[in-house]
């Protein structure tokens, strides 16, 4: 039980990667807060985790709203007494050429990824500093390292998370707080499934070509990364015992990006 007696907050945890991370953490002994904009889905995910016994709560949270984040994190502390792990995972994707990208959509995407990461980090650090320890994990992407067409704000935001993690690693060290970034390749989640027809239409190619020739072309084996792959990396980072591993980004992508 790598996370026995630990408390984790996972944003965007009602579905996809976040939900799998929450399940993996709970199975490893943690108490988990399912934080999500979709309150009904968050409660449903928490109910699933609670079927073996109470180990999860749902927290309705718009990560771009300061009041939502601060009250949500306070609710976690009220329920479980502490916060040991934050996984900043909430995010969206909008696909369009840069010269056609609406400014409002640019701001919305960056707010969810970067403002959300900042607000949840700040709230978590205030509790972690009191406890003299904790770990923060940001959900980056191979797009934290590479660029792709049609994804200007997403690439910008994911690069920004690496910078934030490095600052948190430096500022948090004397308080026993670590920060790292997971950089998955393409994972077959609803977020990616939505992109496939969108890119096919904008690029004038088939959906099969989007998958084979764009998404998986640079992998070593033509395979998608899985939510289980990402969750296991999150568990490794969450349960690491010292500050030896901090300020780093871990790419899990079937070799798409090698560093």
Where are these regions (language model features)?
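Alpha-helical segment proximal to the catalytic Tyr-Lys
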Residues: 126, 170-171, 243
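Substrate-binding pocket helix/loop in short-chain dehydrogenase/reductase
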Residues: 97-98, 102-110, 215
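Short C-terminal tail/terminal secondary-structure segment
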Residues: 4, 146, 234-235, 246-259
